[in-house]
Amino acid sequence: MHKVSIPQSVIDDVVASRGREHVFENLDPARTALIVVDMQNGFLMRGVAHALCEEAIEIVPNVNRLAHAVRRSGGTVVWIQNAATPESLQSWSVRDEMDGPERSARRTASMAPGTKGYELWAGLGVKSDDLFVQKTRFSAFIQGASNLEAVLRSRGIDTVIIAGTVTNVCCESTARDAMMRNFKTIMVTDANAAETDALHNASLIAFYLKFGDIMPTDMVIGCLNANAATARDTAAE
């Protein structure tokens, strides 16, 4: 598990600009979605992964706890699967130019729909009534990457909780673009994973300063449970 380290100076800057440390702690579960990014064998399974992130295996219990809490409180769980499709290989050719032919070939073999690498990691607590969205860019919200935004809008979602791998690429890209599309956005500090602590923390810090909130799993679950209980009490009156 990553050692999360957010400098006090960063927290002070956030409080100075927003008035408090956490601006999205008052979660409305019914309007909240957990977005789990790229927790696939192509990133987690040795011998299959084209870009192995061993830290991602460590966050699986927290991802499952979050998914359970979101469902129980009345929210939505969405599993994002990265895909290398013929269309995306053509329309996003600059990615392959940057990676080079050998790495590009490994990624294509690992991330093609129908392959072992494309499948979600077996240890995830996936339920049949969860939602599944395929994306073809780092960000799930950028134009042409997926239908995630339309799916969320159709359900009245205005808040997204970001978990998954890797923190500083697909998770941060998705989180930043979620905020730019006017979703309240939270990155979960101990339910995202990168290759190193340094990359993980740098990503969280950059996001926290300008794009949204960051919270540990326990805090997110506490916020969900508190408002779910309030909603039940109100309905019973």
Question: What spans do the regions from the language model cover?
Answer:
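Active-site acidic carboxylates
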Residues: 1-127, 131, 223-237
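A short glycine-rich beta-strand->turn/loop micro-motif centered on a GG-aromatic cluster
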Residues: 159-164, 184-197
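Internal catalytic-core helix/loop-beta-alpha segment
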Residues: 113-159
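Short acidic-hydrophobic, aromatic-tinged amphipathic segments that line or gate anion-handling sites
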Residues: 212-222
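Glycine-centered short loops/turns at secondary-structure junctions
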Residues: 72-75, 156, 182
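Active-site-proximal loop->helix
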Residues: 196-208
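Short glycine/serine/threonine-rich phosphate/pyrophosphate-binding segments
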Residues: 167-174
